[in-house]
């Protein structure tokens, strides 16, 4: 079960404050069947511990979430403007580290949660299986098995930051390249993605 314990202080209605503890073990966060309209389906299980304190206009949240190994989820890319020719354009970027030309950083529209301060750590078990269907019928996909430790931060100024390392034990990608039939690419054990102050 997901439990919330604590206090909500209404003594000053202009500055309502909370002091809450949230806890869940082996909690089924997602249980969604595959349907034509589903963007995410599968099952996700988590352990979750967090505190939420302060006036409602300036809430401070601290905690951690463990995504358990029996998790198996799929994300479906839908209504994507990508064509067959550039299907991987925004998913995989090949980098030449010898190229010293600078690339202008694209501007990202920030979403404000009203001064909330959030810092969460997230542990992903190595047995977690995650899949991305690159096309709705699932014929082109990425299947990843692995885990890691990530940190998420949301600042009162509206910045969302993600850091950490996601290590892969195995995986594969099936992708149909124009003129070339469906091809399978295997992901080697030991591959990883390093995230360093990624703005979301």
Give the label of every model feature segment.
Residues 1-198:
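Strand-loop-strand
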């Amino acid at each position: 079960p997901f439990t919330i314990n604590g206090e909500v202080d209404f003594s000053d209605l202009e500055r309502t404050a909370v002091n809450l503890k949230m806890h869940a073990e082996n909690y089924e966060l997602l249980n969604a069947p595959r349907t034509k309209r589903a963007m995410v389906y599968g099952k996700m299980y988590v352990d979750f511990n967090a505190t939420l304190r302060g006036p409602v206009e300036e809430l401070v949240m601290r905690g951690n979430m463990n995504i358990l190994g029996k998790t198996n989820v799929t994300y479906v890319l839908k209504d994507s403007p990508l064509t067959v020719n550039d299907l991987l354009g925004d998913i995989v970027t090949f980098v030449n580290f010898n190229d010293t030309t600078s690339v202008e950083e694209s501007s990202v529209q920030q979403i404000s949660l009203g001064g909330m301060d959030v810092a969460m750590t997230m542990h992903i078990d190595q047995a977690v299986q995650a899949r991305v269907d690159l096309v709705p019928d699932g014929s082109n996909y990425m299947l990843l098995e692995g885990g890691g430790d990530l940190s998420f931060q949301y600042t009162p100024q509206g910045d969302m930051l993600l850091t950490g390392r996601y290590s892969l034990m195995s995986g594969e990608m099936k992708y149909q390249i124009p003129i070339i039939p469906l091809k399978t690419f295997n992901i080697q054990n030991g591959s990883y993605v390093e995230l360093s102050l990624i703005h979301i």
